[in-house]
Amino acid sequence: MGISTVLALSLLWGPALSQGQWIPYTTYHDSVSSPGAPVETTTTEVFPSGLELRLANGGDRCQGRVEVLYQGSWGTVCDDGWDINDAQVVCRQLGCGMAVSAPGSARFGQGPGQIVLDDVSCSGQEPYLWSCHHRGWLSHNCGHQEDAGVICSDAMAMTSPPPDTWPTTVIYESTPHFPSGLELVFPSGLELRLANGSDRCQGRVEVLYQGSWGTVCDDGWDINDAQVVCRQLGCGMAVSAPGSARFGQGPGQIVLDDVSCSGQEPYLWSCHHRGWLSHNCGHQEDAGVICSDAVPTTTPPPDTWPTTVIYESSPVFPSGLELRLANGSDRCQGRVEVLYQGSWGTVCDDGWDINDAQVVCRQLGCGTAVSAPGSARFGQGPGQIVLDDVSCSGQEPYLWSCHHRGWLSHNCGHQEDAGVICSDAMAMTTPLPDTWPTTVIHESTPVFPSGLELQLANGSDRCQGRVEVLYQGTVCDDGWDINDAQVVCRQLGCGMAVSAPGSARFGQGPGQIVLDDVSCSGQEPYLWSCHHRGWLSHNCGHQEDAGVICSDAMAMTTPPPDTWPTTVIYESTPHFPSGLELRLANGSDRCQGRVEVLYQGSWGTVCDDGWDINDAQVVCRQLGCGTAVSAPGSARFGQGPGQIVLDDVSCSGQEPYLWSCHHRGWLSHNCGHQEDAGVICSGAMDTTTPLPDTWPTTVIYESTPVHISGLQLRLVNGSDRCEGRVEVLYQGSWGTVCDDSWDLNDASVVCRQLGCGTALSAPASAQFGQSSGSIVLDDVSCSGSEPNLWSCSHRGWLSHNCGHHEDAGVVCSGPDSRLAVRLVNGSTRCQGRVEVLYRGSWGTVCDDSWDINDASVVCRQLGCGWAVSAPGSARFGQGSGSIFLDEVSCSGQEPYLWNCSHRGWLSHNCGHYEDAGVICSDGWTTVTPPAPTTDWWEPTVTTTVGPSSNCGGFLYNATGSFSSPSYPGYYPNNALCVWEIAVPSGYLINLGFSQLRLEQHSYCNFDYVEIFDGSTDSSLLGKICNDSGQIFTTSSNRMTVLFRSDISVQNTGFLAWYNSFPRDASLRLVSGNSSYGACAGRVEIYHGGRWGTVCDDSWDTQDAQVVCRQLQCGDAVSAPGGAYFGSGSGPITLDDVNCSGTEATLWQCRSQSWFSHNCGHHEDASVICTGNYGTTTASVPNISTSNASYSCGGFLSQHSGRFSSPFYPGNYPNNARCVWDIEVQNNYQVTVTFTDVQLEGGCQYDYIEVFDGPYHSSPLIARVCDGARGSFTSSSNFLSVRFVSDGSITRRGFQAEFYSLPSNDSTNLLCLMNHMQASVSRAYLQSLGFSAWELVVSGWNGNYQCQRQITPSQVIFTIPYSGCGTIKQVDNETITYSNFLKAAVSSGVIKRKKDLHIHVSCRMLQDSWVHTMYIANDTIEVSEVQYSNFNVNVSFYTSSSFSYPVTSSPYYVDLDQNLYLQAEILHSDASLALFVDTCVASPNPNDFTSVTYDLIRSGCVRDETYRSYAQPSPRVVRFRFNSFHFLNRFPAVYLRCKMVVCRAYDYSSRCYRGCVVRSKRDVGSYQERVDVVLGPIQLLDPPAGKKSPGKGSP
């Protein structure tokens, strides 16, 4: 039986937390020295403001204390956050090789000057230390005892020949060139060796440190660490990295622990580790290594063998490992076989994919992998299976370097032998030589079929045209995009890809179509390196020939020469001219202006073609001007006078220099100075010039890749300037934009460009009317971050395939608009009619398509928990305002309701009788209104607003919450927000923080929250910037909360809550029994002259702890509910109390509003404290039931019923694990309703789970927690409910009811013994436009079995499991039989309706058959799941011939008589196998746990008379045993046998594993587990005088 296991990975996606702020310097230098230039003494390159770097107080210039020359004085760097990445930048900048370590704590002594840098955080790639993120110049919170240091690898190098006594470690790494007179000194003799192995390339890892050899601990030791060791010792590649002292325990010290290498380091000690001689392990964990050059040897290595030698080697793997492809048409395709221990074996296809095949093809020198077929595509191999679960990244040098299950370890058969087809398999025209090696080791450059070339045909020059490949043929445009074109342009040396036209833009090719479904990342070296369908495999015609236009196609003025190569391969190593410098000219300071580069002694400009924020980022970083603010083009800072030195610059933003970016070539351009590029960096000074009064509606800050002057943008035909039809001014005329692929990202760019706030919707289909002008843009695709609309990807100016009926529109929020949502007319703030504040007015939402996902967004936005239901039809009354939204469709993950897809603002086709509502979990009760005698007020509606407007406000509810701007996103700099809270007179206010994360400071001087006891003129209750858990309480009915942030360092901010309570509130305990004393009883609260009670919803010991402390009664012993001390008589004052346990008073805890509840006095809460137990004889009541025996879970098969937690309504036990399986008749659905749920608070402790089928293999419908109620419905006839409790705190538990109703009657599926029966409603077919005669089985070949049977209401198909095209799919856990019904449009030239595909499948799972039916997504989807039992026939037979079954019941036998049993699977599939796992005898057919006798258990024979017989087929099992002696004491006996169903001949499955002693779980896979009960068996009356009967013959 199969167990379907789904592993869900939840990625917590959140903003990275910044530890500091980059503060640029602002001085200006006309020249910047070339990186890498020689330096004098200990200084490196000179930067603006005279920045220099050195290492001081070390043994040489490449180790020491880090010092920076800043403003003319040397200062140090603090070690806060200092690590190997920071040290790497220092070493590179000083030309000192690689970083070896990054010591802190003033390892090289304390420096005398200032501390100039702190909190330095480098990625390791920066060109200069001050390019890294840091706290700011001279800003720190440390002393010189934390001065940072660095040790670089060149600190260990020598410039003079080594002495005769040179250690055994030889370093061949190259030494950088420095000015004469510098000598680099080696530190104290670090060496490396492998000890106690059979040769020098395998053994225990040992390091010579401070003159003694020591070992390395295996904590974290892996193949990457071993790789470094093998390379350092010149021993080839790492084969394995054994730990646990595989090569014996070493005698010396443990010198390294927690070693973590990337695999690229030059020395083992270059890797990250715990520190020298620092460890937490013993020698039993000594690490080892086996390298590929390890070879068996019978003599010890020579005494003079060096322990570390660096040289190149050709790996020869141990024990003669080889690789070949067998049974293919040539050596480059076939079944994968590995020579292991002298024999060829195969590789299993589990997890086998193109990455694995890539390694095989490279290893054999067969080019790149074309495909990775499994399922013994090249026949089943004869030998062993040597590898399984192979998982390669594609970069490994050998197949056995990949991760795998282990040699000769597998769970598969030869029917799963893996194969490979390499690219060179198709180019072989001559037979293979007899001496062809089976394993050839080549360099990693791919070898492709001979003679492959690439060209662009039928274009105006060699860099544009139809893509053709020799194999001469074309490429199909299926999936063809700009990434594919990029590879073509790079391969041909034609610059960057401009566009990737399809549909035979350059004419239809005459030859073959050689490639289809090409999918490139854009980084591949050749087009045929990209993923594709396979050579000459396609499903297209030449009308789909793909084309390319490259950037160099636009600069060609002469025809290409006849000898122009069709494929040009360039070297990827950049070469820069000498003397390059960079500056920004003609701006108000050095950090803004026109970009100029000093090239060949003259300053020149950069063209703005393709110029964007990434390019500007490189400029700003290179000049030390902070981050890029904008990248203006069109000579924003005036036209430059010199040459144009660079054009088509394209940076990723990470490059160290502007000229490191991809560009057209030096002095190569197609532009003029009117397109000079500019940059504005964050380090630029603010301008004081006011903006002109005539500011246009479109301001162009950024340049566009197509250089057209006068571009503008507007929205027309809307109610104001921030909504309407999108129009662009192009070449002097206004034109529209087509709505093809138009979405909210595109609209966001428009709204931001026009200064109109955020995008609310992106209406299409000319919602704002059709224009009469040109259509200037089509197929616009924005990421949402572009500076203007024309920066987005589009089809090209004036290129389109649409009409004005597709004009795109936009609705923006407006520059000063405020959006909010609220729930009105409900009994609490968390239920009611949904209303939205839009442009100053409240309006409703229509219920068309309104569902639980939409409600979820509303509940989360309002802080009301999760959505319980989404009622429509004006459940909460009809609204009176506008209807703002209709056809809302949310995924449930959106932050605000208006982010969901909808029809458009104020666009609807409904009335207020369809107003949508929401009920959230925090408001899912009917609240009893307060009595007229109280002084409580009518609750008001709480609203929440979007991030643009949630900075401050007036709060006037009894309880509520608010947050910092954009929470949980980062709050802005320079924020000042003020919230005023006011409650009725006579009430006080509590304020607490659920989350609080601000910039940290001991005095809260930067970002902080201030709480005032009234207005801001009142006394200060507190000033906080970190989460102390404190609750602030006012002395009046008013409170003011102020939040302020400074100009730097943002964080996620805070989420605050508040509640209110009467000033005269007091507390007591009432027990009615004096023996309990004053510290135990019913909790009562006084207010307004009356005592009231507290409801026990969510009441626990944390709440009780607050009560006990407030009354000075010691600690809480228990928190009984259910009116344990009797029911009170006054009002119910509080409900849903939720204390952390640290509050000073009960009313500081969070709860519902006072007198708001959904309970009665039978739920009054109580407390028992420790206070008086020392002076009373009364015992503490025991309310725990955790030690009592109980029944838990079960199988429910009736039409309806009820179940509950153990001991309900008493407290359930701890550590409960209960599962109820509810199965009803086929084609019915199950609904379960929870009528009472009282569990421990917090859904991670005690909870209920509802599954859509068996719980171990089905999707989770819902997790039900304390206080939640609701109904949940299955999609099939099976539903599981699982209850879990932890080891502490129990409560009353839950009660649930269930019932079943018929599912939809459109489709129906039954999985029977020999076939599946599918029925489709004729009415359903008619509704889709099909007749009953058009529906057929897809694989029907005329077989009468598959013909349809048409009744007046149904079309019925009988589909055998082994015919009519039924497909059988198997894996280790399931067997699935699949087919599908189809109805297609088969006549005419065009069609106006979709084809119909109804997929049907029967899948065997653990305890039942799963029946699924669905319709493919080219039509409406319909799903049905049905469960039924698997059929196995078990019978007694009269003899070992198994010819005649026993038909009588009871079956009367003699004592010790041979009994013969046969079991058989009743199913038409002949490829199933049956196995007897367990057989147990009992005198009671309903109790197999009390008095039992084991015949066989877990496949292990327990009865001496048990004997199995040969199986006539895998689906039949036969065995015998003798009647039992204990039958003398009982009138009858019953057998219960557990049978296991598996795949036949799957020797890894349970059916072929025999006796297995299980300790934790079942071993081996199977498809089905079947429990069978047989009997009764009764003894015959024994003949007189018979005393010792003998056993019968076998």
From Swiss-Prot:
Residues 1310-1558 form the ZP domain. Pfam families: CUB, SRCR, Zona_pellucida, ZP-N. Its main location: secreted. Gene3D superfamilies: Spermadhesin, CUB domain, SRCR-like domain, Zona pellucida, ZP-C domain, Zona pellucida, ZP-N domain. Expressed in small intestine, liver, stomach and kidney. Present in small intestine and in collecting tubules of kidney cortex, medulla and papilla (at protein level). Keywords: Developmental protein, Differentiation, Disulfide bond, Glycoprotein, Protein transport, Repeat, Secreted, Signal, Transport. One of its GO terms (cellular component) is extracellular matrix. The keyword Protein transport applies. It is found in: Secreted. Residues 951-1061, 1192-1301 form the CUB domain. Disulfide bonds join 78-142, 91-152, 122-132, 217-281, 230-291, 261-271, 348-412, 361-422, 392-402, 476-540, 489-550, 520-530, 607-671, 620-681, 651-661, 738-802, 751-812, 782-792, 846-910, 859-920, 890-900, 951-977, 1004-1025, 1095-1159, 1108-1169, 1139-1149, 1192-1218, 1243-1265, 1479-1537. Highly N- and O-glycosylated. The O-glycans are heavily sulfated. Residues 53-153, 192-292, 323-423, 454-551, 582-682, 713-813, 821-921, 1067-1170 form the SRCR domain. It comes from the Eukaryota. The SRCR domains mediate binding to bacteria. Interacts with LGALS3. Binds SFTPD and SPAR in a calcium-dependent manner. This is Scavenger receptor cysteine-rich domain-containing protein DMBT1. It comes from Oryctolagus cuniculus.
